[in-house]
Amino acid sequence: MPGTLVYVMGPSGSGKDSLIAYARRKLNAPYSLTWNASVYARQGLRPVAFARRHITRPADAGGERHYALTREEFQSRKRAGEFALSWESHGLYYGIGREMDSLLARGAVVVVNGSRQYLPEAMAKYPALAPVLISARPEVLRSRLEARGREKQADIDERLSGAAVRLHDIPGLVRLDNSGALEEAGRTFSDLFLRLRRMPTPQAG
């Protein structure tokens, strides 16, 4: 596929949602996978879209905007082949709509909030994906998880234990520390997409 899939990962509390929202505002990019690509073409830029995830979590649970599904709805859509990517984490199911593939085929930059554990499967399906790892110091992770008030203490401890997952020998991996002010990491994060959208749109062979 000639487009670029940017696969963003990081432990709970690293601030992935906040960074993605920051970059989306900076680029004035859509929070879904539909837009008028011809407008971007006239500007000489590659389209950038931030995928809105399907999650088995209530719509009013806080955090990112997502498509809320029951487990039964999720599994039905998965069986129907409606997801380009899907995984399970901390008792929840996550999916990215298959419309992502048509956008990549048109040369778009598609940004996905992914999972570190699912990275090998994602790389097998999209070998040219651009992986980005967001991190933060352990005490910052705990403080953020406690502040958002979504999890019980035992759940927070479980998420923090998973924060120690290490990624090694990942080609092209971009690492970004988000322990400080959002604007600090946000500028660096946004610059990545500004560079990608200015790149010539690859031509399909």
List the predicted regions and their residue ranges.
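Small-molecule kinase domains that catalyze NTP-dependent phosphoryl transfer to phosphate-bearing small molecules
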Residues: 147-205
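Walker A/P-loop
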Residues: 17
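Short hydrophobic/aromatic beta-strand immediately N-terminal to the Walker A/P-loop
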Residues: 5-7
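Conserved phosphate-donor/acceptor-positioning beta-strand/loop module used by diverse small-molecule
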Residues: 110-115, 124-148, 163, 176
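ATP-dependent small-molecule kinase phosphotransfer cores
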Residues: 42-110, 116
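ATP-binding Walker
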Residues: 14
